[in-house]
UniProtKB/Swiss-Prot annotation:
Keyword terms of this UniProt record: ATP-binding, Ligase, Nucleotide-binding, Purine biosynthesis
Keyword Transport: no
Biochemical pathway: Purine metabolism; IMP biosynthesis via de novo pathway; 5-amino-1-(5-phospho-D-ribosyl)imidazole-4-carboxamide from 5-amino-1-(5-phospho-D-ribosyl)imidazole-4-carboxylate: step 1/2
PROSITE patterns reported in the protein's UniProt record: SAICAR_SYNTHETASE_1, SAICAR_SYNTHETASE_2
Catalytic activity: 5-amino-1-(5-phospho-D-ribosyl)imidazole-4-carboxylate + L-aspartate + ATP = (2S)-2-[5-amino-1-(5-phospho-beta-D-ribosyl)imidazole-4-carboxamido]succinate + ADP + phosphate + 2 H(+)
Family: Belongs to the SAICAR synthetase family.
Annotated organism of origin: Lactiplantibacillus plantarum (strain ATCC BAA-793 / NCIMB 8826 / WCFS1)
Protein name in the entry: Phosphoribosylaminoimidazole-succinocarboxamide synthase
SUPFAM superfamilies with a match to the protein in the record: SAICAR synthase-like (SSF56104)
Pfam family, one: SAICAR_synt
An individual GO BP term: cobalamin biosynthetic process
């Protein structure tokens, strides 16, 4: 474990994680929570072991991305529910990368479910619980001073890199990466850095053999036991990462 890092004041509790300051101003203490939410947090249910599973999945993915040249905020996983991460100033954007039609894209454009795209589709959503995270385009991002055009361009570049690597990871697991959501922050030097988490909470995953959902849609649509599904994702991921 990083030497002498101590948990201090609670900074923020979100839908899936609680963030704490530490005795190092550059490091945050993240605790993954045993709960699932839907409808932008309006539905919240305790889920046994979910925090532990998501923490381990996210930790393995962040380490893999770093090993493949994609920098991110992950430092280490000192315990089952805790992650130490580099502190960044979060950019209030959710970046969604879509490889096939599903969810809101499918509904909005009446595209057949899981229609594959010739190239990835990138979308931005403005992070605001009050506004229900509305879609936002490049011009609107600039008009609202959310991020500069240069930062948006860098987010897009990194998002496509992440997509390329994640697609390969999940394919090796026998899983189709349909789409996913990621977030970025700025370091003290202004560098754009991948942050937040990558887990079945933020990805849409489909078993290539059975077509079964292996993500939070299991909770959203009451399709089965979320804990066992996330455990299956972790088991496959660990096998791939240890190969």
């Amino acid at each position: 474990m990083t030497a002498a890092i101590e948990k201090q004041a609670l900074l923020y509790t979100g839908k899936a994680k609680a963030m704490y300051a530490t005795n190092d101003p550059e490091i945050l203490w993240v605790e993954y929570l045993d709960q699932a939410t839907a409808l932008n947090g309006k539905r919240k249910v305790p889920i046994d072991q979910k925090g532990r599973l998501n923490n381990r999945i996210a930790s393995l993915i962040f380490k893999d991305l770093a090993n493949h040249g994609i920098a991110n905020h992950f430092i280490e996983q000192p315990s089952d529910y805790v992650q130490l991460v580099r502190r960044v100033t979060m950019i209030p954007l959710e970046t969604v990368v879509r490889n096939a039609a599903s969810g809101s894209f499918e509904r909005k454009f009446a595209v057949p479910h899981l229609t594959k795209f010739a190239e990835p589709v990138l979308e931005f959503f403005y992070k605001s619980d009050q506004l229900d995270d509305p879609f936002i385009n490049d011009s609107q991002i600039h008009a609202l001073n959310v991020a500069t055009p240069a930062i948006v361009a860098e987010i897009k570049r990194q998002a496509l890199q992440v997509n390329q690597r994640l697609t390969a990871i999940f394919a090796a697991m026998g899983v189709q990466l349909v789409d996913f959501k990621i977030e970025f922050g700025l370091t003290t030097t202004g560098k754009v850095l991948l942050a937040d988490e990558i887990s079945p909470d933020s990805c849409r995953l489909v078993d290539l053999k059975t077509g079964a959902s292996l993500d939070k849609d299991v909770f959203r649509k009451d399709l089965g036991d979320l804990t066992s599904v996330y455990q299956e994702v972790l088991t496959r991921l660990a096998t791939v990462e240890e190969a």
